[in-house]
Structure formats: C-alpha cells, structure tokens
Amino acid sequence: LFPYTTLFRSPFNMYTFNKMWGVVTPEEAAAKIEEQRKEITGEPQNLEEQAISLVGRDIYEKLIKGYTEKQWGRDCKDLPSFIIKRLPVRLTFDNNYFNALYQGIPVGGYTKMIANLLDGIEVRLNIDYLEHKSELDTLADKVVYTGPIDAYFDYKLGTLEYRSVRFETETLDKSNFQGNAAVNYTDRETPWTRIIEHKWFEFGKDENGNDLP
C-alpha cells in the first residue's frame, strides 16, 4: 500500500533538513539552502522559483513539485509564486503549522461542534440559493453566499477553472494504520494527495481511542 520508504516532517523544519541533508544545526541547514537558492536570481516569477528560493532545489524536487502539480493539475512553472509563500519554513525543531499562541481542535471533532451550534436553528438542505435568491434574500438582513463566485455573477466574466476534491472513506480492522493524523504523498505518481487517520486529531487518546492517563 505505501509507495514510499522515507518519511519527512512538514512544515519544513530542522527535522526535514536533517533527514534530507544530514545537517544537525540551523547554521548548516541555512548554508545548504543558501547554496541551492543561488540559481534563482531576481524576484521569483512562478511557484517553482519561489519554492527553490525558500528551501532549495532538493526539497522542491522531493517534497513540493510532484505534490503541487498533482493538486493543481498544472506545471509549477505555470503557477503563481504566492501559493507557496504561506508554507512555514523554520530553522528550529518546531513541527507546528501555525504560529498562534493557542491552537486546538474541538473535543469530539468539528462535526459535533457544528451540530451543537445548529441546535435550535432551521437547516434546509438541497436548495439552490441562486434558484431561490429573491425568496431567500428576504429572510435575513445579510446573506453569506459560499457557492461558486462566477455563478453568483452569472458568469459575466466567464467560467473559472476549479479543482475538485474527492474523499474516499475506508474503515480498517486496525487500531493503528499510519501512526499520524495526516500523511501526504508528495510524488506525482500516487493518485491521492494524503491519507487522514482521524483518531490522531483527538489529543490525549491512545490508538484504541481511550483517554491517556
């Protein structure tokens, strides 16, 4: 099942750089990145150039290129540079994606949280807002539309390109499948981007879902 033999930490940090290059200090990692980013001169013009300028070509080729092109269906040279700028790069051993002081996931997951928020609120399903716009707009002072923006404006500026996401759910007779909440598959050949094992999002639980002492 697993098309890989090596695991890297993400977002990119000292664990990533140690596994990729064998470096052990921030100074060594910074020097390695600086050596590889020299091929990019001037302001990066696309995602490939931006990625190389951030972390060097080795990490770009191994962990960014295939994954990104699989997600977007475009060559990295044809994608804008700003897409990759949001990805943290740290010369520390911090694995957190975000820098916020307080971070967390609702106990029981977001489904339970939303269910509690909707308690006592009318919910209508399978209703196309655009087909019933005049009626629905009278129900509130403000309406938040979350559908396709080009459809909202009746495609006056043309049709936007969209990338769809397909979710496949499997229940396995295993207490521990991959040992982590998310494992991303960064090669171009694997036909999926990641596998999620939801139980590991619940902090303070063991592999059987029991509370840790």
Segments (PLM) and residue ranges:
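Active-site/ligand-binding neighborhood in enzyme catalytic cores
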Residues: 11-142, 146-153
